[in-house]
Design a protein with these regions (language model features):
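Catalytic core of pol beta-like nucleotidyltransferases
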Residues: 1-32, 41-46, 57-114
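Glycine-rich beta-strand-to-loop/alpha-helix junction loops that act as flexible
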Residues: 36-38
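Short, aliphatic-rich beta-strand segments
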Residues: 49-55
């Protein structure tokens, strides 16, 4: 599995991901963040967003999603990046239903843990 240092990222993208990990893990200590998509594969275009999966032990509800959105929005503005967020409960993500999702297959194949 690749590390963040090995990826073809612009410096502002690298810093944004580092700050995202720090802030999300401060607020949700059990969080796991996985980069996937074109940035993880190394074939991103100029307009590509940064796709991230955030796994959390808590139940996913509107309030939690709003908290994550506030964190990501501030970082997006600061570093001039755009995140594509998927937030899931860790137990659900391990379930057979989640494992049957094409998104899950892609993240398993190309995902990079931050």
């Amino acid at each position: 599995m690749k590390s963040l240092k090995e990826l073809k990222l612009k410096e502002n993208e690298r810093r944004a991901l580092q700050e995202l990990k720090k802030k999300i893990c401060e607020r949700f200590p059990d969080a796991e963040i996985i980069l996937y998509g074109s940035k993880a594969r190394g074939d991103a275009g100029e307009e590509s967003d940064i796709d991230i999966l955030i796994l959390i032990d808590s139940q996913i509800n509107r309030k939690l999603k709003e908290e994550v959105t506030e964190i990501t929005y501030d970082i997006e503005l600061k570093y001039d990046v755009v995140f594509g967020n998927v937030i899931e409960n860790r137990e659900f993500w391990k379930s057979p239903l989640a494992n049957a999702m094409p998104l899950h297959w892609n993240i398993d194949k190309e995902g990079i843990r931050l």
